[in-house]
């Protein structure tokens, strides 16, 4: 079971004929795959930013999660982003992020209001400096491998969602705490604003899961609404 590779699928009606078609989870990320390069001016508070760097930690995360991204942050406005890193929750500039990362891509929740963006920023401010969830990250490695069984092709989305949550209950436990790793922090920030991205436990979500919540992709777990692609701030 530990060696199985997963690729989530979904059966959707064809755009023109309405006939059922089988969609596969997409790993495409580069602007050459249909994206566009943007500047930080295009960002709005609450935008979700996914990144990848060339270091060993990033490569390891991408290999384990079978994803082109390894980190997640949230845009606060005023050229600042918030993120959970090893030193804890921190706020830094977009320029600093662009200097450190090889790939930076932004997504937006279509229903996020200005008031909810303020609530997200309030959540961030109240958690700045809090500790990183090292235990959650360590548990992600075996969980990421075990869950691939649930993500085999042709597994129905509801079954896949139930399967992943079941494995998470065993591998991760069901408790909650006030320490976060990067993608968990994003999920909790949105939940605090009354706009949860999913009903699943934020601790089972990795940056790749956030990527697959985008429009036109196949999410591994059930989501409330797809994220809209904003653009790439940097591409490898």
Protein language model annotation of sequence segments:
Residues 1-236:
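Cysteine-nucleophile amide-bond enzymes
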């Amino acid at each position: 079971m530990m060696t199985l590779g997963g690729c989530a699928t979904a059966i959707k009606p064809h755009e023109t004929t309405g006939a059922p078609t089988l969609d596969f989870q997409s790993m495409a990320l580069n602007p050459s795959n249909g994206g566009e390069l943007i500047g930080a001016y295009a960002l709005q508070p609450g935008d979700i930013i996914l990144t990848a760097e060339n270091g060993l930690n990033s490569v390891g995360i991408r290999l384990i999660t079978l994803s082109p991204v390894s980190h997640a942050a949230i845009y606060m406005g005023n050229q600042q982003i918030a993120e959970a890193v090893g030193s804890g929750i921190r706020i830094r500039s977009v320029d600093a992020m662009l200097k450190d990362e090889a790939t930076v891509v932004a997504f937006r929740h279509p229903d996020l209001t200005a008031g909810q963006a303020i609530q997200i920023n309030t959540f961030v401010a109240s958690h700045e400096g809090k500790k990183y969830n090292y235990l959650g990250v360590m548990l992600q490695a075996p969980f990421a491998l075990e869950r691939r069984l649930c993500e085999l092709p042709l597994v129905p989305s509801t079954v896949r969602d139930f399967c992943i949550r079941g494995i998470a209950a065993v591998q991760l436990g069901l408790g909650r705490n006030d320490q976060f790793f990067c993608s968990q922090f994003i999920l909790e920030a949105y939940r605090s604003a009354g706009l949860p991205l999913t009903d699943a436990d934020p601790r089972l979500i990795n940056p790749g899961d956030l990527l697959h919540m985008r429009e036109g992709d196949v999410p591994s777990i059930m989501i409330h609404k797809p994220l809209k692609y904003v653009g790439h701030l940097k591409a490898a």
